[in-house]
C-alpha cells in the first residue's frame, strides 16, 4: 500500500433535500449509518447535549422562546461529502457552517426589510410547507409577502409562528 492509501479516510455522500424537517435530517444520517439514533442527532443539533455552536452568529441570534427545536430550518439542505468515522458534532457543524456561508450574503437584505434571520428562516419554512411543490414556492412567497407588507388590520398583527419552527 502507498502512504496515501494507508491514511485515506472513507467518505460518503449525504443528501438533504430542501424542506426536510430536522427529524427527517436526523433520520437521513441514521439511515446512512453515520449516527446511532435520531435523538442523538437532534440533541446535538439543538445543543441540548452541551454541544456549542456559538461560533456561528446565527446560532446566538435564535430566540430562546421555548421552541421545540432550535435547529429547525438551520440544517442547510445540500449534498455533503462527509467522513464516515466522525462524531455527530462534525456532521451538524458541517451543516451549520454551510448555512452560515450561504446566508451571510443575505444579512443586509434581511436587515433592510426590518426583520431577523430567524423570521426569514421561519417564513421560508412556511412557504415550503404551504406550497408543497417547489414550482409553487414563488406564488406562495408572493402571497405571504403581500400579507406581511399589507396595512390591512387583518394582517398587521401577524406573527411568524409555525409548528415546525416554534
Where do the protein language model's features map onto the residues?
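Low-complexity, Pro/Ser/Thr
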Residues: 164-165
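Conserved catalytic or metal-liganding residues and their short signature motifs at active sites
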Residues: 1-159
